[in-house]
Structure formats: C-alpha cells, structure tokens
C-alpha cells in the first residue's frame, strides 16, 4: 500500500494536541495491521472498526482536558484517512456505517 497520510488535517491544526492525534493514529494503524493479515468477512471488518471507533471515543475526555475536542474537523480528518484505506483493501462498507459507533 502506498504510504498512508494519517490525520493530516488534525496534525496541521493546533487545536488538536499532537500527542492525542498520535493516539488516534495508533488506533487506525492497529486496524490497518488487522486488515493486512488477510481476508476477513464484512462482519469481522465492521467489528474491528467498531473497536477502533470506541477506542477513539474513549479519548474524548483527554481532548477536553487539553482544551480540545473531537468535532467536525476531527471527524473529517479521520474519514479522509480511512477512505483511502477502504479503497486499497477493496472494502465496500459505507464510511458512516463503518464509523457507526462514533460519538464525534
């Protein structure tokens, strides 16, 4: 896979603390590692993305504690990172469904 540009919008915006963006990046990276292991059915892929999304949700308090939050800019940056990953692995799940557990 070509190099993934993780969360460019969040890294470029000083509203988002880089150490917290790194935590989201790790959540996404772990999901990519899962996808690289082989072919999975749609249910397994959805379950992994649900797990990733719940882990990102769990970071919300840390964002608040650092005068930030997971909001529209974060949502867009996360989606812009994930959409090329879906295309690369030929995953045909709508991004809204894929991130159905999100609270941001």
Predicted stretch roles:
Residues 28, 33-60:
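Mature extracytoplasmic domains of secretory-pathway proteins
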Residues 64-104:
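Amphipathic alpha-helical binding modules
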Residues 20, 38-45, 67, 71-74:
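Residue-level recognition of alpha-helical structural elements
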Residues 25, 29, 50-57, 76, ...:
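Generic structural signal for well-ordered, non-transmembrane alpha-helical segments
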Residues 1-37:
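Short terminal alpha-helical segments
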Residues 13, 34-38, 59-62, 84, ...:
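Surface-exposed polar/charged interaction patches
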